[in-house]
């Protein structure tokens, strides 16, 4: 999803869209986004968030926290730090809409706390798996995801699964495809 986000930001910038990105990172991470894109980093393994990045898969290619191991205290820290950073981004950047990756906890928080803005969610499949496996705020997540203005699915089968899991209509879900970088492939 990090690659997906980066490529999406690059494509939207090439089409002339102004963007800001809120992303969970480590202090030493380098973010590669177009020059005029404002970054609002949420730093993990810091004083505010003393644990590794919450990974959408149980095994990530970097140090991470599994959602199934996240305590209520950790979930509260996660929510507070991300929401503080997103509020700052919304105040400074004044977006027309918010695009959020993964139909999971952070997207649910965004939907709840920014009701005045259209919020679109991208499904990456790992989010659906996490929701099926973990009880962490499961009903809250389902309720908030159902309120998204638009959901992007990777394919038709996933669209059907999203409609069933979140009780949304087929009209709320758009199949966007997986995407690729044409400069590489």
Predicted segments with their positions:
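Acidic anion/phosphate-binding donor-loop and adjacent secondary structure
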Residues: 17, 131-133, 163, 171, ...
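Short amphipathic alpha-helix
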Residues: 2-13
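Short beta-strand scaffold positions
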Residues: 100-101, 153-154, 175
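Carbohydrate-associated surface elements
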Residues: 25, 157, 179
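A conserved catalytic-core segment of Leloir-type glycosyltransferases
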Residues: 24-92
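Active-site proximal beta-strand in glycosyltransferases
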Residues: 97-100, 110-130
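Membrane-proximal helix-turn-helix segments that form the acceptor-binding/catalytic region
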Residues: 134-151
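Histidine-centered beta-alpha loop that forms part of the nucleotide-sugar donor binding/catalytic region
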Residues: 1, 103, 123-126, 177-178
């Amino acid at each position: 999803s990090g690659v997906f986000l980066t490529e999406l930001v690059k494509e939207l910038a090439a089409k002339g869209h102004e963007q800001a990105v809120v992303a969970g990172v480590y202090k030493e991470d380098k973010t590669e986004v177009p020059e005029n894109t404002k970054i609002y980093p949420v730093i993990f393994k810091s004083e505010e968030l003393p644990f590794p990045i919450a990974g959408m898969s149980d095994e990530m290619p970097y140090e991470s926290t599994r959602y199934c191991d996240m305590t209520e205290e950790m979930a509260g820290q996660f929510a507070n730090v991300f929401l503080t950073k997103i509020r700052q981004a919304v105040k400074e950047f004044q977006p027309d809409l918010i695009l959020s990756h993964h139909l999971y906890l952070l997207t649910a928080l965004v939907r709840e706390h920014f009701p005045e803005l259209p919020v679109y969610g991208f499904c990456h499949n790992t989010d659906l798996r996490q929701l099926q496996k973990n009880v962490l705020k499961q009903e809250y997540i389902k309720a908030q995801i159902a309120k998204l203005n638009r959901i992007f699915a990777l394919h038709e089968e996933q669209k059907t699964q999203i409609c069933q899991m979140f009780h949304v209509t087929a009209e709320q879900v758009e199949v966007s495809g997986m995407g690729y970088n044409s400069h590489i492939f």
